[in-house]
Amino acid sequence: MGNCCRSPAAVAREDVKSNYSGHDHARKDAAGGKKSAPIRVLSDVPKENIEDRYLLDRELGRGEFGVTYLCIERSSRDLLACKSISKRKLRTAVDIEDVKREVAIMKHLPKSSSIVTLKEACEDDNAVHLVMELCEGGELFDRIVARGHYTERAAAGVTKTIVEVVQLCHKHGVIHRDLKPENFLFANKKENSPLKAIDFGLSIFFKPGEKFSEIVGSPYYMAPEVLKRNYGPEIDIWSAGVILYILLCGVPPFWAESEQGVAQAILRGVIDFKREPWPNISETAKNLVRQMLEPDPKRRLTAKQVLEHPWIQNAKKAPNVPLGDVVKSRLKQFSVMNRFKRKALRVIAEFLSTEEVEDIKVMFNKMDTDNDGIVSIEELKAGLRDFSTQLAESEVQMLIEAVDTKGKGTLDYGEFVAVSLHLQKVANDEHLRKAFSYFDKDGNGYILPQELCDALKEDGGDDCVDVANDIFQEVDTDKDGRISYEEFAAMMKTGTDWRKASRHYSRGRFNSLSIKLMKDGSLNLGNE
């Protein structure tokens, strides 16, 4: 009968065992090939089988080192969360120290309604397990995506909670170092649910005046001094300022299609307050954003000063009018999509059946008022207005620029369908297979750099080699020099935009990025 009769909990438990046991974890000594004893990470906790006291059920989330499961305490039947960190993935002394420090910091910080509570840490031969309170309301990140952005009043409330977490950490000698929307969960699904910080995996203890040089964090939320390898607790306020900017407008203040481009934007420090919806946002909110994103950490606000700022103090009086809609958020998402995905969407558009494309075609024909086969900015603005989608001129211009690969200032039918496909997310596996075959010219089951370059050349531009290399850096996740169908489908389904990119973390990659920035002159270390 196979697996059909087993409970999800049984499957989950077996998955945990398969993840952490077996020959992959076994270590052999140099002499006789005998297995060495499993590594010990936490010296102050008893070694025990977690399943003696807890039932591990369905998977809730997955990170670079750990898998988080729904966890049921056998004695009380309480629902909890368990983050299981595989020892097999702790390959270096630095990795082991990170886990030790994460546990130490969660035990060190006082109990707070804004920080997830660690019930206990335990360890067996295969993993370190952190048993924590369960937060069922989902990520702050996901609520931003679902809404596009918050009202000012809601943004002020969320920002207050985030900065209170920062203040608590700094008061107790901890720098978080990885503040981002994904690391905050709502306790429940209610609108007024408490918000809790959950992940302290990159956090570190500090003493007043102490400086750090290791580049860690998530690209879009990094302070400039992190890139310059000379930073202190002020970086958490910068990251909170980036989150505030996103809460108010739906995109980060510094973004580009490559990590190097993002880093250079951060170092330039130019903040856009002109694009919608910023003209409708209060000056006090903008003032706070500016002071939190102050490039000089010595002049940047402290957590205490942020909480004393008039916009936070008067949060209940802040405007409660929605600042935009989900369509705007999706348009922005499309605007940072790489050229590979844009091309693939156009290929898919050509394969759509008459039924699938009929509604899109009707909309295009209605917008193309002069019947010349293209939609101008004015026609697009008028059409979106007719379809009850209120977009400012800057938003429409951004949409045109995102898909208008030839720089005509207009959209032809194929480009228009590509936009609609992305917004409606109608591409299925059959469409993706056809699009993949278009790029896989030799039919060997992989897209090679030259094949991608040749496809990009069809849309013009002589920089296809550099663009193809950048795309491979992002999409070729197993780094075998080719793009498989699975990697292609993952890119198409999740998007190669800032939301996906913000989840990536790699010490090696950021160290390499820092070297690049020094070589091209972006970093001016002499000013520190």
From Swiss-Prot:
Taxonomic source organism: Arabidopsis thaliana
Q: What does this protein do?
A: May play a role in signal transduction pathways that involve calcium as a second messenger.
GO terms under cellular component: cytosol; plasma membrane
Q: Which PANTHER family match?
A: SERINE/THREONINE-PROTEIN KINASE (PTHR24349)
Summarize where Ca(2+) 4 binds, as residue positions. D476, D478, D480, R482, E487
Q: Which lineage do the record's taxonomy fields give for this organism? A: Eukaryota, Viridiplantae, Streptophyta, Embryophyta, Tracheophyta
Q: What is its EC number?
A: 2.7.11.1
Q: Which InterPro entries match?
A: CDPK_Ser/Thr_kinases (IPR050205), EF-hand-dom_pair (IPR011992), EF_Hand_1_Ca_BS (IPR018247), EF_hand_dom (IPR002048), Kinase-like_dom_sf (IPR011009), Prot_kinase_dom (IPR000719), Protein_kinase_ATP_BS (IPR017441), Ser/Thr_kinase_AS (IPR008271)
Binding residues annotated for Ca(2+) 3, in chain numbering: D440, D442, N444, Y446, E451
GO term, biological process aspect, one? protein autophosphorylation
Q: Does the keyword Kinase apply?
A: yes
Q: Which SUPFAM superfamilies match?
A: EF-hand, Protein kinase-like (PK-like)
Residues the record marks as active site: D178
Q: Where does Ca(2+) 1 bind?
A: D368, D370, D372, E379
| Inhibition and activation profile | Activated by calcium. Autophosphorylation may play an important role in the regulation of the kinase activity.
What is the official name of this protein in its record? Calcium-dependent protein kinase 13
Q: Residues bearing covalent lipid (N-myristoyl glycine)?
A: G2
Q: Say which family it is in.
A: Belongs to the protein kinase superfamily. Ser/Thr protein kinase family. CDPK subfamily.
